[in-house]
Amino acid sequence: MATATSQSAPTQRIKMRLRKGDTVQVIAGKDKGKTGEVLRTLPNENRVIVEGVNMRTRHVKPTQEGESGRIVTEEASLHASNVMLYSTAKKVASRVELITEKDGSKKRRLKKTGEVID
């Protein structure tokens, strides 16, 4: 008899207009108002990892004999809907729109400031 495994239903993927290296501001949660750089995007989970935001402590066991265990502080992921792209020049967070240039290339533009990102 097969054992039952608990698998969560697949989440519906949202269009993330965030890339690695973008500066974002947290708009909800305990770290609301903090800004940081996107270290990694997890598009299948609709999550991002932001530098210096949503820090978690983890206890690591020693791997070799004679080595001591340690406590590691690292960033945990945030849902992509809880962050907004941040303009460092104008110091304001804004939604993003996709525009098509005359040559056919697609760029991202901040709606509040009109600043083109890519």
From Swiss-Prot:
Keyword annotations of the record: Ribonucleoprotein, Ribosomal protein, RNA-binding, rRNA-binding
Q: What is this protein called?
A: Large ribosomal subunit protein uL24
Any one GO MF term held by the record is: structural constituent of ribosome
Among the entry's GO cellular component annotations, what is one?
ribonucleoprotein complex
Q: What does this protein do?
A: One of two assembly initiator proteins, it binds directly to the 5'-end of the 23S rRNA, where it nucleates assembly of the 50S subunit. One of the proteins that surrounds the polypeptide exit tunnel on the outside of the subunit.
**Protein family according to the UniProt entry:** Belongs to the universal ribosomal protein uL24 family.
The Gene Ontology biological process annotation of the record reads: translation
**Quaternary structure, from the entry:** Part of the 50S ribosomal subunit.
Intrachain disulfide bonds: none
Mind telling me which HAMAP family this protein's record contains? Ribosomal_uL24_B (MF_01326_B)
